[in-house]
Curated annotation (Swiss-Prot):
Matching PANTHER family: BICOID-INTERACTING PROTEIN RELATED (PTHR12315), RNA 5'-MONOPHOSPHATE METHYLTRANSFERASE (PTHR12315:SF1)
Localization annotation: Cytoplasm
Sequence positions that bind S-adenosyl-L-methionine: R32, N66, D96, D121, I122, M150
Name this protein carries in UniProt: Pre-miRNA 5'-monophosphate methyltransferase
Job of this protein: O-methyltransferase that specifically monomethylates 5'-monophosphate of cytoplasmic histidyl tRNA (tRNA(His)), acting as a capping enzyme by protecting tRNA(His) from cleavage by DICER1. Also able, with less efficiently, to methylate the 5' monophosphate of a subset of pre-miRNAs, acting as a negative regulator of miRNA processing. The 5' monophosphate of pre-miRNAs is recognized by DICER1 and is required for pre-miRNAs processing: methylation at this position reduces the processing of pre-miRNAs by DICER1.
Classification via InterPro entries: Bin3-like, Bin3_C, BIN3_SAM-bd_dom, SAM-dependent_MTases_sf
Main location: cytoplasm
Its EC number(s): 2.1.1.-
Pfam families to which the protein is assigned, alphabetical: Bin3 (PF06859)
Annotated GO biological process: methylation; negative regulation of pre-miRNA processing
GO MF entry, a single one: RNA methyltransferase activity
Gene: bcdin3d
PROSITE patterns assigned: BIN3_SAM (PS51515)
Domain Bin3-type SAM: 41-253
Amino acid sequence: MSNSESVPHVDPGAAPYGNFPNYYSFNPPENRISLLPAELLHKLFRKPAESDSSTQPLLGLDVGCNTGDLSVALYNHLTEPHSKSSDVPVHFLCCDIDPDLITRARASNPFPDFISYATLDIMDSSAVRGPVNDFLQQFARSTFDIAFCMSVTMWIHLNYGDQGLVTFLGHLANLCDYLLVEPQPWKCYRSAARRLRKLGRQDFDHFHSLSIRGDMAENITQILTAEGAAKLIHIFGNTSWDRSLLLFKIQRHPC
């Protein structure tokens, strides 16, 4: 799919791209936020150079942001007053394939100067290049400090297959220095396929042909860490939905 505007308006129970219209009513942001240490920024990111009179902002990319509830919760969590890094300005670019969800996210955005929303298909490299590059260029940067990929990998995998998942993770790794991933376990794949069948919808093109299956947290870790591309540095436990939060540091190798 090359155009995010072509996302069909489907029964809320189907949502073949994970674009559930009321997603946060049954999976509230607190399910993830409660697992993340309040000092995440302070521990991960470099401090501004003492000789630099300006504070280097922290840039975050949230892929598959839905209506933005989790994006806002992450922003609040990373800038909360008791954090030692709360004086570091934080700017988020948040994207989703569904234009209706992005419209709702923009309408309810409490921090329009710090959180930006864009409708885009993350698998369309030409579509991504514009808004992503434009955002980074505002800060004279080539990568984000951190990217968030929260309950997105399954939808990429089901719609684009094994190679699509590998390509997606590689693309994200190229865009950031740290990557926080919340993979859906394999049982969620079966549930997603079953929902489509119950609604009389066509099954996911790749569901039955996937060879990457089983322990998806382990599979995604293997994909990201292959050939030293990234290092798994922390596992923040499991959410109430039995989903792991995996933090990777992307390894930049000199040419």
